[in-house]
Swiss-Prot record:
Catalysed reaction equations from the record: 5,10-methenyl-5,6,7,8-tetrahydromethanopterin + H2O = N(5)-formyl-5,6,7,8-tetrahydromethanopterin + H(+)
EC number(s) on file: 3.5.4.27
Gene Ontology biological-process entries: methanogenesis, from carbon dioxide; one-carbon metabolic process
Protein name: Methenyltetrahydromethanopterin cyclohydrolase
Keywords carried by this UniProt record: Cytoplasm, Hydrolase, Methanogenesis, One-carbon metabolism
Length: 318
């Protein structure tokens, strides 16, 4: 079975070899763990963001940038993501399934290290995936860098030595944060299908694109814009082999949610910033195209809503 930690570590090695080119800042801590600053203080940009996204997906995806029009008005950068291992790349690796709260430090953990720590265990049981590697790679969405105690905790949970852990760190409101969160557009569709009860192992390949949101000064506002990129302008194409996918397609798009129609930050604020008051169905791409190769049929659902996306991004024409 492929090891997503092994594959991701090869990407990390490239990042370390060309740290200055990617404008990232590696730090070796007292316990010999490695923390790579990708946006807390470092001035990393698009290229580091693409690699960060690949690491989040266990090295099982290709990422690239392109230029598309938003609402037929302005050309804007989009991220494109493709994978031939959708369930593993998105659920076993990319899903932010590890809430890290240790020694006063909080971060959302993504990436292949989750597979070693089984965070959460149910995810790996459902897709029947396990990783066994002596090095752990984790991606942290946080506005601070972790200290030795945090890295010791991650190592312990993963069953490896602290010297065999590397963490990539980027805040939500940073260029890398914008890229890697927009790069979750495919994951949104795969996760939604998993929550609906679809066996995601039937998904053969996946492709998605979403605009890379502008960086906001306020982290809470940035959380809104980064989600809106996929919720209102994310497009995903899935190649599926059976599994009665036709019954699930209409339920995938974000427009099926009761919270759809307003910028995410507005909805979140109305809910008094309580995630439990939000409809989880909102975390989905705007539109999906699904080709079922077992029947030869292709289904579409949802639509792009550029108006809400641009409202969220806060574009001002001068």
């Amino acid at each position: 079975m492929i090891s997503i930690n092994e594959i991701s570590y090869s990407i990390v090695e490239e990042m370390l070899d060309f740290a200055e080119d990617y404008r990232i800042e590696p730090h070796t801590l007292a316990n010999d763990s490695v923390v790579i600053d990708c946006g807390v203080k470092a001035k990393a940009g698009y290229e580091a963001g693409l690699l960060f996204t690949q690491v989040c997906m266990g090295g099982l995806a290709q990422t690239s940038l392109t230029h598309k029009k938003l609402k037929h008005e302005v050309f804007y950068p989009f991220i494109e993501v493709s994978t031939d291992f959708p369930a593993i790349a998105c659920l076993a690796a990319q899903k932010a399934g590890w809430r890290i709260s240790q020694d006063g430090y909080f971060a959302m953990g993504s990436g292949p290290a989750r597979a070693l720590a089984l965070k959460p265990k149910h995810t790996y049981e459902v897709i029947e995936y396990e990783d066994d590697y002596d090095f752990a790679v984790i991606a942290l969405e946080a506005d601070k860098l972790p200290n030795e105690k945090v890295m010791d905790y991650i190592a312990s949970e993963c069953g490896v030595d602290s010297s065999d852990v590397v963490a990539l760190v980027a805040p939500t409101n940073s260029p890398v944060g914008s890229v890697q969160i927009a790069g979750r557009v495919v994951e949104m569709a795969i996760y939604k299908l998993a929550e609906l009860g679809f066996d995601t192992r039937h998904i053969v390949s996946a492709f998605g694109s979403a605009p890379i949101p502008p960086v906001k000064k306020d982290a809470a506002v940035a959380m809104g814009t980064t989600n809106d990129a996929s919720i209102y302008h994310g497009s995903v194409t899935l190649t599926v082999d059976g599994g009665n996918i036709k019954d699930f397609v209409p339920k995938i798009p974000s427009s099926t949610s009761k919270d759809y129609g307003k910028p995410f930050y507005t909805v979140f604020k109305e809910a008094k910033f309580d995630f439990y008051k939000l409809d989880p169905g909102i975390f989905a791409p705007a539109e999906v195209v699904v080709n079922d190769i077992s029947t030869g049929e292709t289904y579409i659902a949802g639509k792009i809503n550029a108006d809400v996306c641009m409202e969220s991004f806060g574009f001002k024409k001068l």
